[in-house]
């Protein structure tokens, strides 16, 4: 697919027992999770039950049942952060990790129809119109995870203010986490981040 664009990437870890109330600038810097020179932006939010921290390098979301690290730049620093943060909360009952990549591509020349329309299906025939858009959900095992790909039609706004028809490709590499192996399995998944990213690029450039 031509002109696909990566618009987001994040790592989300689900578990019971995170303590958002301690996740602040002092905690992150004293724990060596971020450097002393990295500035926490003023629009960051810190409460006992909800934390959202904005920096030029990442956005961090932490709630009692999960945390999510959204990459802005420096993927290697991000991977180190996720591993270090997970260890700081080693008492958490970890349940799953998801590594996620989001892309958009212009839905030109009925691309969504070319990819997903099934002419032999009576359901699809009901949507065989000029205004119809199509998507899909695909899943399979990949390395130590299950890859889930969701494709949805959406719209964007061009610089001139007009709408742009797009397809949103959302890749999720999901791994269940069990007991005493949880931190080891988190590390395995995080170490596969680059392989997951490359595999998504391969699919999007096919």
Where are these regions (language model features)?
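Short glycine-/aliphatic-rich beta-strand segments at the starts of folded cytosolic domains
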Residues: 3-16, 99, 103, 128-135
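Amphipathic N-proximal alpha-helical interface segments
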Residues: 51-71, 75-79, 148-171
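N-terminal low-complexity, intrinsically disordered segments
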Residues: 1-71
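Aromatic- and glycine-enriched beta-alpha-beta binding-site module
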Residues: 68-106
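Short beta-strand-to-loop capping motifs
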Residues: 13-16, 70-73, 103, 171-177
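Aromatic/basic-lined ligand-recognition segments
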Residues: 108-170
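Short, conserved charged micro-motifs
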Residues: 19-24, 76-80, 109-111, 179-187
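Mixed-charge, glycine-accented linear interaction segment located at domain edges/termini
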Residues: 145-206
């Amino acid at each position: 697919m031509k002109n696909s664009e990566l618009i987001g990437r994040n790592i989300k870890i689900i578990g019971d027992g995170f303590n958002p109330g301690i996740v602040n600038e002092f905690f992150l810097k004293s724990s060596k999770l971020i450097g002393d020179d990295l500035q926490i932006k003023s629009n960051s939010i810190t409460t006992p039950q909800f934390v959202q921290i904005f920096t030029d390098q990442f956005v961090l979301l932490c709630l009692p049942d999960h945390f999510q690290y959204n990459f802005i730049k420096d993927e290697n620093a991000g991977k180190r952060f996720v591993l270090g943060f997970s260890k700081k909360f080693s008492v958490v009952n970890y349940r799953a990790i998801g590594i996620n990549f989001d892309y958009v591509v212009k839905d030109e020349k009925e691309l969504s129809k070319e990819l997903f329309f099934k002419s032999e299906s009576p359901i699809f025939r009901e949507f065989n119109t000029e205004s119809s858009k199509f998507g899909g959900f695909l899943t399979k095992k990949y390395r130590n995870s299950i890859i889930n790909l969701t494709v949805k039609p959406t719209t964007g706004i061009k610089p001139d203010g007009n709408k742009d028809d797009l397809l949103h490709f959302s890749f999720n590499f999901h791994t269940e986490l069990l007991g005493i192996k949880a931190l080891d399995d988190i590390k395995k998944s995080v170490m596969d981040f680059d392989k997951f990213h490359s595999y998504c690029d391969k699919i999007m450039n096919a």
